[in-house]
A protein has these predicted regions:
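PP2C/PPM-type serine/threonine phosphatase catalytic domain
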Residues: 1-282
Length: 282
């Protein structure tokens, strides 16, 4: 069936944006959307180059969001370095996992964790001898190798997927407040008022980074959302689900969600990525 076939490049609907918000003095967020292809390098030919400059088969699609930790020196530089490092790692290392063979999935998951730790080391190196107060950032990446998808997370930038009429959050906030909830010391409904809601328990470049990887099957018309907490502090999960359910295009959803967050104060930097694989006729 066509629904089970790997989506063509023209079936992909991908869009991302970032906004400083209405309060912060700078934007410390960064994002990247990319596809990895097999390509031909031509070193000499008598043929017209227009016949040869064709990308090979796409074997992976990915999106990354990084939110530089506010209040630390170099938060913007940290998020940029994290995104650059993980993109380079993906390009140079993950090609060997171009087929998500179940027998190789454990090794692939470890490679993703290795990518996060590589970014952690790169950002830590920016801080010199600083033990506690160097630059830091969140990092959340979704990477699809059809028909599987993987979500890598450090920090509290989130990943959601909407499908079959329901929204699922695929990440757990790595914050002190969430740790309190998990231990029973704090009620989930009290997190928004907790002074620890934005205190990261794990961060790229922080004291420690604890990369978490989850895996799922991809389906056409599932909608994936990656975002920094500048969106989710103003827009509820229920509202996210409504927006993704009514998608006309990835760009439209990103713009609608950004507008809603800004209307409600835009108190932090806001970064949003939306992606889906459409059915060929949609």
């Amino acid at each position: 069936m066509a629904a089970d076939l790997k989506p063509r490049d023209e079936d992909l609907d991908l869009f991302g944006l970032t906004h400083q918000g209405l309060v912060r003095s700078e934007n410390q967020d960064h994002f990247l959307i990319g596809t990895l292809h097999r390509e031909l390098a031509v070193h000499g030919t008598s043929l017209p180059m227009s016949q040869l400059l064709l990308r090979g088969e796409r074997f992976a699609t990915f999106g990354v969001v990084a939110d530089g930790v506010g209040g630390t020196a170099g938060g913007a530089a940290a998020s940029r370095r994290a995104v650059e490092t993980i993109a380079q790692y993906v390009q140079s290392t993950l090609r060997c996992f171009s087929v998500a063979n179940p027998d190789h999935e454990a090794a692939f998951v470890e490679a993703l964790r290795g990518a996060a730790l590589e970014a952690h080391a790169a950002v830590r190196a920016m801080g010199g001898d600083a033990e506690d107060y160097g630059p830091a950032t969140t990092l959340t990446m979704a990477i699809g190798i059809w028909p599987r998808a993987y979500v890598l997370q450090v920090g509290d930038s989130r990943c959601y997927v909407y499908g079959d009429g329901a929204l699922r959050r695929l990440t757990r906030d790595q914050t002190v407040a969430q740790d309190f909830v998990d231990s029973g010391a704090l009620k989930a409904e009290d997190v928004a008022r907790s002074p620890y809601r934005n205190v990261l328990s794990s961060a790229i470049g922080g004291r420690s980074a604890d990369p978490v990887v989850s895996a799922l099957n991809q389906r056409r018309d599932n909608v994936v959302l990656l975002c920094s907490d500048g969106l989710t502090r103003h827009v509820t999960d229920e509202e996210l689900g409504v927006a993704l359910a009514s998608i006309r295009s990835a760009e439209q959803v990103c713009q609608d969600l950004l507008r809603l967050a800004l209307e409600r104060g835009g108190t932090d930097n806001i970064t949003i990525i939306v992606g889906r694989a459409r059915h060929p006729m949609s």
